[in-house]
From Swiss-Prot:
Purpose: Involved in the synthesis of meso-diaminopimelate (m-DAP or DL-DAP), required for both lysine and peptidoglycan biosynthesis. Catalyzes the direct conversion of tetrahydrodipicolinate to LL-diaminopimelate.
Co-factor requirement: pyridoxal 5'-phosphate
Protein's UniProt name: LL-diaminopimelate aminotransferase
Organism encoding this protein: Trichodesmium erythraeum (strain IMS101)
Listed InterPro entries: Aminotransferase_I/II_large, DapL/ALD1, PyrdxlP-dep_Trfase, PyrdxlP-dep_Trfase_major, PyrdxlP-dep_Trfase_small
Length: 411
């Protein structure tokens, strides 16, 4: 009989969001009359920007004409999209990123896991706690951890607690680590990072020959001009960091699928023989072998994000969700709850009332208010006592959810 990858057996039972879905479905079956409002998983609700729809409609028509039909595209992505990204997202912010260092993909979630294909198995890996579960689970799958303990932590990972006391920004580890996961604006806490803070991480990474995996999926929600949108705004980052970005949350591409990963050609890792190897070459080889590229139609839609009309429409979407976050923060505070995030970020991080665990609070909101959020403990042990609420929903649903909470749930 063929053997399996035993590392999958080390995964904690049930990925966070399927477990939420299971509980919600059980409740809905028992209470079919309940009008459940979901503010849990970070999926968008508003339609795609018109500029993107028009571009994709045109691209569909091109696929119906032999003279403009497109077959397999370049695995790295079409140059016309990568060049716009390089010019507007990076060079326009003073980042020396070339279009050739950008790889178009079907999701930053995929890339943050797939990047482990080119990373060795003997690295010391640091993650924040709480943390986006994908960073941890993909390392478990890849065999980079030991077993899980009673706290839900995996042996072999270095956990960096982020709490209100440190503004939900991890402190530099006292030990040497080789791989560092950072996400700003942060999922799940909604925290942001200053240039000075990120500089300390870049300095650490360069001093310790470490690599930073920087998730910038929510950078479009930054409205404070003093905050960096990219790790490459930090001096020295091109020598130590890979950045992941997505069109999912800024342009609503969660169901359309388009993202990008930046791998600078100056970034190197160590081979077993001690030689330095360019990670760009490895990632290019990996993508060429395992990935056939994002569809032409979708890439034309992503390109439209950079048109004048597209930029204005994306800005409107961002402002819409940020206004939702503002409403959530103000209404939860009115209910007597302590909240963090929701500014320069689409997530609101709520401290649960005294005596209630994260899952207790989840059940209480579901049963009493028919509102769904995400238990903080699902993001790590340090997330216990917190709860994530997403601003990704219609204004009507956000207002109704907050009305229910303020009326039925008072601290």
């Amino acid at each position: 009989m063929a053997t399996i990858n035993d590392n999958y057996l080390k995964l904690k039972a049930g990925y966070l969001f399927p477990e939420i879905a299971r509980r919600v479905n059980t409740f809905a079956e028992a209470h079919p009359e309940a009008q459940i409002i979901k503010l849990g998983i970070g999926d968008v609700t508003e339609p795609l920007p018109k500029a993107c729809i028009q571009a994709m409609t045109k691209a569909v028509a091109e696929m119906g004409d032999r003279s403009t039909f497109k077959g397999y595209g370049p695995e790295q992505g079409y140059a016309w999209l990568r060049e716009k990204i390089a010019a507007q997202d990076f060079q326009g912010r003073g980042c020396d990123i070339d279009a050739s260092e950008i790889f178009i993909s079907d999701g930053s979630k995929c890339d943050s896991g797939n990047i482990l294909d080119i990373i060795g198995n003997n690295n010391t890996i640091a993650v924040t706690d709480p943390v986006y579960p994908v960073y941890v689970d993909t390392n478990v799958m890849a065999g980079n951890t030991g077993a899980v303990n009673e706290k839900g932590e995996y042996e072999g990972l270095v956990y960096l607690p982020i709490r209100a006391e440190n503004n939900f920004t991890a402190e530099i580890p006292t030990q040497k680590v080789d791989l560092i996961y950072l996400c700003f604006p942060n999922n799940p806490t909604g925290a942001t990072a200053t240039k000075e803070y990120l500089q300390t991480w870049v300095n650490y990474a360069r001093a310790n020959d470490a690599i930073i995996l920087f998730d910038a999926a929510y950078e479009a929600f930054i409205t404070d001009a003093s905050l960096p949108h990219s790790i490459y705004e930090i001096e020295g980052a091109k020598e130590c960091a890979i950045e992941f970005r997505s069109f999912s949350k800024n342009a609503g591409f969660t169901g359309t699928r388009c993202a990008l990963t930046v791998v600078p050609k100056t970034l190197k890792g160590k081979a077993a023989d001690g030689s330095d190897v360019e990670l760009w070459k490895l990632w290019n080889r990996r993508q060429s072998t395992k990935f056939n590229g994002v569809s032409y139609i979708v890439q034309r839609g992503a390109e439209a994000v950079y048109s004048e009309e597209g930029k204005a429409q994306v800005k409107g979407l961002i402002q819409f969700y940020l206004e939702n976050a503002k409403i959530i923060c103000s209404q939860l505070q009115a209910a007597g709850l302590t909240v963090y995030g929701g500014v320069n970020a689409p997530y609101v991080w709520v401290q649960t009332p005294t005596g209630l665990s994260s899952w207790d609070f989840f059940d209480k909101l579901l049963q009493n208010c028919n509102v769904v959020g995400t238990p903080g403990s699902g993001f790590g042990a340090a997330g216990e006592g917190y709860f994530r609420i997403s601003s990704f929903n219609s204004r009507e649903n956000v207002n109704e959810a907050m009305k229910r909470i303020t009326e039925k749930f008072k601290v």
